Design a protein with these regions (language model features):
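Flavin (primarily FAD) cofactor-binding/catalytic cores of flavoenzymes
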Residues: 2-63, 74-218, 229-388, 403-438
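Flexible "cap/lid" subdomain of the alpha/beta-hydrolase fold that forms the substrate-access gate
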Residues: 65-68
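Charge-dense, low-complexity polyampholytic segments
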Residues: 389-393
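Long alpha-helical segments found as membrane-embedded helices
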Residues: 395-403
Length: 438
């Protein structure tokens, strides 16, 4: 239960971004009596769930849905409507976030169409400067501007002479009618787009560079996540869990090699789609391995084959772009943030990050609750952080865990294992309440 903050020490916090993470942070802070100013680049709440967002950063396409079940994705104290779909679309998620902002009286604290130009430490506080002039000082800043605003492109992008676009720019399938289209990648957006366009294209091909397990969205009439939740136990080693998932997937889809993919032997980000494999059965989609080179419209693959395409849609991920922060505080190589428990910069008191992760199973929004609650406790002085050296040791432990269990590609730079993370966070919060204040 959140208790009101000590009104004798009135805190003032800037939150950057009115997407799911920013709204959640604002809600927890406001509940403690903290003065919150939320800066939003666009003209509405919802972040990446706003179709054709006028902030210029939105990746939403017309067929976009949640990949995790609504009941395990929702904020802890604000469920989706009980009579709604299991997997809401972007319109329903946007309405949900709008309702959340209204329910917790967040809207009046938001400044829309406000671009943050610079955030810098100043006289024991944080100075936030806006584009067009004007600056304000805050006791703390929460960066919740998301990590899907700046697309990353393959090295051969300029070698392809047909139409090229990143999945970030995709909206609807109609412009690709009767074309030969190559979709690069096996992330959620890539498989969504391939399944979306294949009903109108002449041919649709997916290039999967890395091994992938395409799990069914439903098993035995319920979401697959529910089945896994009952079968998988905390004590189970990962190889046993992986074998279980391969068996369940094989019952529904067969072996991945049957469709041109390679079954992974390490942990990978889960891929799931309700109709992707059906399109393979109907020969609407075919698979190819990774790309060696591109010349004109001809693409050469690692298996020695080649094919010509009219359009390439690259689902090749994003770089984390935080131009308003000093270079030393920005992501390493544009991908990995050096943060203690994904929230705190060890050398910058009062600078917090929210929602800068990809959950390996489950819903991102639910994890944002945990982060926002912790940030609020830190802002209000309920918990005390360890020394920077200790924070860095914990950060290295987490990176070591990720290196052991996940591929080393940029896609996994923000990967977050929910079980491991929650154990770490619970342990830190217990210790933080016991540390003496300074």
């Amino acid at each position: 239960m959140l208790m009101p903050a000590d009104t004798a020490i009135r805190r003032r916090v800037a939150v950057i971004g009115a997407g799911a993470a920013g709204l959640c942070a604002a809600k927890y802070l406001l509940a403690r009596g903290v003065e919150v100013v939320l800066f939003e680049l666009g003209s509405s709440v919802g972040g990446l769930w706003v179709y054709d967002n006028d902030n210029g950063l939105g990746p939403a396409y017309r067929s976009l849905h949640l990949n995790s079940e609504a009941r395990v994705t929702a904020y802890r104290d604000f469920p989706f409507a009980p009579d709604g779909p299991l997997y809401p679309d972007h319109l329903e998620v946007r309405r949900y976030l709008q309702a959340y902002a209204e329910r917790f009286d967040i809207l009046r604290h938001i400044r829309f169409r406000a671009r943050v130009q610079d955030v810098a430490a100043h006289a024991g506080q944080w100075r936030v400067q806006l584009e067009g002039g004007g600056s304000e000082d805050f006791d703390a800043v929460v960066v919740a501007s998301g990590h899907q605003g700046v697309p990353t492109h393959p090295a051969w992008k300029d070698d392809f002479t047909g139409q090229y676009l990143h999945s970030h720019s995709y909206r609807v399938p109609e412009p690709f009618r009767d074309q030969r289209v190559l979709v690069v990648g096996m992330g959620n957006s890539a498989v969504d787009i391939a399944s979306d366009i294949c009903v109108v294209t002449r041919s649709t091909t997916i290039s999967a560079r890395s091994p992938v397990l395409v799990m069914p969205r439903m098993l035995f009439g319920v979401p697959t996540s529910r089945v896994l939740g009952k079968l998988e136990k905390p004590w189970m080693p990962w190889p046993l869990r992986r074998t279980m998932r391969e068996i369940l997937t094989g019952i529904v889809h067969g072996r991945m090699e049957q469709w041109g993919f390679v079954t992974p032997k390490t942990r990978t980000h889960p891929t799931s789609h309700p109709s992707l494999m059906s399109h393979f059965v109907w020969n609407r989609i075919t698979a190819k391995p990774g790309i060696v080179s591109v010349k004109g419209r001809e693409v050469h693959f690692t298996d020695g084959t080649s094919a010509s395409f009219d359009t390439v849609i690259a689902g090749t991920g994003y770089a984390v772009d935080l131009p308003f922060l000093a270079p030393a505080l920005r992501p390493l190589d544009g991908h990995r943030l050096e943060l203690f428990l994904r929230v705190v910069h060890p050398a910058q008191r009062g600078l917090y990050f929210a929602g800068m992760f990809n959950v390996a199973g489950g819903g991102n929004i639910r994890m944002m609750d945990d982060q926002a609650e912790w940030i609020t406790s830190l802002v209000c002085g309920d918990e005390v952080l360890p020394e920077p050296a200790q924070m860095r040791r914990v950060m290295e432990q987490e990176q070591s865990f990720l290196r052991r269990h996940y591929p080393g590609s940029p896609r996994y730079a923000l990967e977050l294992d929910p079980g491991f993370y929650r154990r770490q966070l619970a342990h830190e919060r217990k210790r933080g309440r016991l540390r003496p204040t300074t």
